[in-house]
C-alpha cells in the first residue's frame, strides 16, 4: 500500500531551470502547482577579455545532474516517491551558443553567453552585406542584427576557432542553444542523444523563420552557417526523448521553453495583451500578441511565445530586453565590494530611500531595447561629496526600474493599449524596495506571485501537458490561481516624471563611448570601462579629500 503522504501528492513534474548565474531543479504537483522540493547550484562565468562572457558547457551539464540528484534525495527524505515524477521540462538562458563534437560528446569551445560583445565587428561586417531590403533579417526573424543572438556567435566561432572549423569540415559538429546541449546529453549523448530545440529557442538564433516555423535557408546562406549543424525544431510541449542516466532514468523530457517564454506561461499570460516582466541577470518584458506577429516600430523584438503541442498553433510576443538588471548587483558585490551579499543592496537602499540625485546607467554590454546601441557604456553621474554607497545602491535599483519603464512605454505605443498593471517574477522580485520603486516609477500597480518560481512552473506545465504525459491540464478552468502580492504607487506622478526625465539625460550621456577600431590601432574595450570607473574613482578621491580637509573622522 502506498504511503498516505506519497499518495496525496499525485503525479509530479520536474523542471530544470538553467540560467546565467545558476541551475535549479524544481518539482511541482501537477494537480495543485505546489512546489514540493528544489535544489540550486551556482555557476561560474569567465571573462577572458573585456566584453567577453563564457561558461563551461560541462559545468552546466554537471550542475543539472547534481540538482536532479539532490532534489530527489530531498523528496526521499520527505517520504515522497520519485517514481511519481512523470515528466521533466527544461527552461534555459536563451541565445547562449554551444558547439560540440557528436562523436566524443565534448564541447568544442566554451559556451558564448548571450551578454557577450565580441561579435560587434562581425555584426558590422554582416550589416554591410545585407541584401537590398534593410529589413531582410528582421522581417524573417523579428530580431535586429545584434551581438545578442546566436547566429553571430556561431559565425564568430567558425571564423576564429580552428578546431571548430575542422570539426565542421569533418561533419562532427553540432550546434545548439543550452536546451539543445542539455537534451542531447540527457537523452544519451553520443549513444543516441536527441539533437533538438523548441520553437521559442530557435526563434532567438536569427536563423529561424518565425512565420514558416522552419530554419531559413536564405538566412543560413547569409550567415554562412551549414544547415546540418542545426537541431531539429519541435513544439514546446511534446516528448523529445527519455533521460538515460541518474535518478530519473526513463522519465521523458517533454517540455522546453526559453526562460522568458517559460515565465510567460508560468504567469498564465495566455490571453492577447497580457504581459509579464522577469527580473534576473537581465530584465525581460514580454507581451502576448496572440497568433499574429506584431512588428515593433519602437525598438522591441518580435518572438515566438510558445507552441504548446505538435498540432497547436504558435503564439507570438513583443519583447523588450534589458541586458543588465541583477547583473548590476553582482557587479557591485564582486567588482566594487560595496555589498557582501546580494541581499545587502536592499538594506543599503532602504537606509537612505533616495539616490540623492545620483543616476546609474549600467550599460556594461551596451544598451538593448529600445535603443540597440552597442557603443553605450556604464556611467554613474550626479555625484556630490555627500554621495555614499547607499545612494549608489539605490541608484542601481532605480536603474532597473527606469529601463523597465522605457520598454513598457515602447510596448504601449506598439500595442496601442496601455498596461493597467505589471505582472512580475524572477529572483530580484524578492527585493521589496525594488518592487515599490517599480510601482512608483511606472505609476501603475506591480503584482508579484508569492511563489516566485514561475519560470520553472511554465516549463513544468509544458512538460506535464504534453501528449503521452497528460498529467497537467492547460484548460483555463483547470489552471491553478497563484496568490499575489500587490505594490501600489506611493509617490506623485509629477515626481516620477522628473526622475525619469533626468534618467533619460543620463542615458544619452552613456552613448558613443566605443567605436570600431582595428586590432592594430588598440583595444577599444580599454576605453569602454573608463566612464564608470573614472566617476567612481574620482568620487572616492573627492570624498576622502573632503573628509580630510573638514577634519571629519
From Swiss-Prot:
One Pfam annotation reads FGGY_N
Q: Where are the transmembrane segments?
A: 526-546
What name is this protein filed under? Glycerol kinase 2
**Assigned keywords, A-Z:** ATP-binding, Cytoplasm, Differentiation, Glycerol metabolism, Kinase, Membrane, Mitochondrion, Mitochondrion outer membrane, Nucleotide-binding, Spermatogenesis, Transferase, Transmembrane, Transmembrane helix
Classification of source organism: Eukaryota, Metazoa, Chordata, Craniata, Vertebrata
Q: Which GO terms describe its molecular function?
A: ATP binding; glycerol kinase activity
Topology of the protein relative to the lipid bilayer = Single-pass type IV membrane protein
Question: Record's PANTHER family?
Answer: GLYCEROL KINASE 2, SUGAR KINASE
EC nos: 2.7.1.30
Q: Which family does it belong to?
A: Belongs to the FGGY kinase family.
Q: Which reaction does it catalyse?
A: glycerol + ATP = sn-glycerol 3-phosphate + ADP + H(+)
Identify the species of origin: Macaca fascicularis
The intrachain disulfides are: none
Amino acid at each position: 500500500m502506498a504511503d498516505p503522504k506519497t499518495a496525496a501528492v499525485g503525479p509530479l513534474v520536474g523542471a530544470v531551470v538553467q540560467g546565467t548565474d545558476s541551475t535549479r531543479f524544481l518539482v511541482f504537483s501537477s494537480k495543485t502547482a505546489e512546489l514540493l522540493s528544489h535544489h540550486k547550484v551556482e555557476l561560474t562565468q569567465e571573462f577572458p577579455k573585456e566584453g567577453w562572457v563564457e561558461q563551461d558547457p560541462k559545468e552546466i551539464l554537471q550542475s543539472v545532474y547534481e540538482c536532479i540528484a539532490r532534489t530527489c534525495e530531498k523528496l526521499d527524505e520527505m517520504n515522497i516517491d520519485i517514481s511519481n515524477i512523470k515528466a521533466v521540462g527544461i527552461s534555459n538562458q536563451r541565445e547562449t551558443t554551444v558547439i560540440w563534437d557528436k562523436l566524443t560528446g565534448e564541447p568544442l569551445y566554451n559556451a558564448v553567453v548571450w551578454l557577450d560583445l565580441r561579435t560587434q565587428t562581425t555584426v558590422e561586417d554582416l550589416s554591410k552585406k545585407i541584401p537590398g531590403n534593410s529589413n531582410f533579417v528582421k522581417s524573417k526573424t523579428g530580431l535586429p542584427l545584434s551581438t545578442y543572438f546566436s547566429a553571430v556567435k556561431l559565425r564568430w566561432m567558425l571564423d576564429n576557432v580552428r578546431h571548430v572549423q575542422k570539426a565542421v569540415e569533418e561533419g562532427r559538429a553540432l550546434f545548439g542553444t543550452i536546451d539543445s546541449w542539455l537534451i542531447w546529453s540527457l537523452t544519451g549523448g553520443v549513444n543516441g542523444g536527441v539533437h533538438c530545440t523548441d520553437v521559442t529557442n530557435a526563434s532567438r538564433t536569427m536563423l529561424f523563420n518565425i512565420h514558416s516555423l522552419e530554419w531559413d535557408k536564405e538566412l543560413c546562406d547569409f550567415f554562412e552557417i551549414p544547415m546540418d549543424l542545426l537541431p531539429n525544431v519541435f513544439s514546446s510541449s511534446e516528448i523529445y526523448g527519455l533521460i538515460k542516466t541518474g535518478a530519473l532514468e526513463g522519465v521523458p523530457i517533454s517540455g522546453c521553453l526559453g526562460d522568458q517564454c517559460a515565465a510567460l506561461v508560468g504567469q498564465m499570460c495566455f490571453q492577447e495583451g497580457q504581459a509579464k516582466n522577469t527580473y534576473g541577470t537581465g530584465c525581460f518584458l514580454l507581451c502576448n500578441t496572440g497568433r499574429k506577429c506584431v512588428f515593433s516600430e519602437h525598438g522591441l523584438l518580435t518572438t515566438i511565445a510558445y507552441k504548446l503541442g505538435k498540432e497547436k498553433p504558435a503564439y507570438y510576443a513583443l519583447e523588450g530586453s534589458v541586458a543588465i538588471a541583477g547583473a548590476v548587483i553582482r557587479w557591485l558585490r564582486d567588482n566594487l565590494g560595496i555589498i557582501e551579499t546580494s541581499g545587502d543592496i536592499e538594506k543599503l537602499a532602504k537606509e537612505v530611500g533616495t539616490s540623492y540625485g545620483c543616476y546609474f546607467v549600467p550599460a556594461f554590454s551596451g544598451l538593448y531595447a529600445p535603443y540597440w546601441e552597442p557603443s553605450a557604456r556604464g556611467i554613474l553621474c550626479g555625484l556630490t561629496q555627500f554621495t555614499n554607497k547607499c545612494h549608489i545602491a539605490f541608484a542601481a535599483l532605480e536603474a532597473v526600474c527606469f529601463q523597465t519603464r522605457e520598454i513598457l512605454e515602447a510596448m504601449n505605443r506598439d500595442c496601442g493599449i496601455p498596461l493597467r498593471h505589471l505582472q512580475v517574477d524572477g529572483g530580484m522580485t524578492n527585493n521589496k524596495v525594488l518592487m515599490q520603486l517599480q510601482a512608483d516609477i511606472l505609476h501603475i500597480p506591480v503584482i508579484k506571485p508569492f511563489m516566485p518560481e514561475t519560470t520553472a512552473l511554465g516549463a513544468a506545465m509544458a512538460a506535464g501537458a504534453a501528449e503521452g504525459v497528460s498529467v497537467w491540464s492547460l484548460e483555463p478552468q483547470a489552471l491553478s490561481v497563484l496568490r499575489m502580492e500587490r505594490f501600489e504607487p506611493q509617490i506623485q506622478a509629477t515626481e516620477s516624471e522628473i526622475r525619469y526625465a533626468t534618467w533619460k539625460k543620463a542615458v544619452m550621456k552613456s552613448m558613443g563611448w566605443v567605436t570600431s577600431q582595428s586590432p592594430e590601432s588598440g583595444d577599444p574595450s580599454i576605453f569602454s570601462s573608463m566612464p564608470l570607473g573614472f566617476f567612481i574613482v574620482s568620487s572616492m578621491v573627492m570624498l576622502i579629500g573632503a573628509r580630510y580637509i573638514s577634519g571629519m573622522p
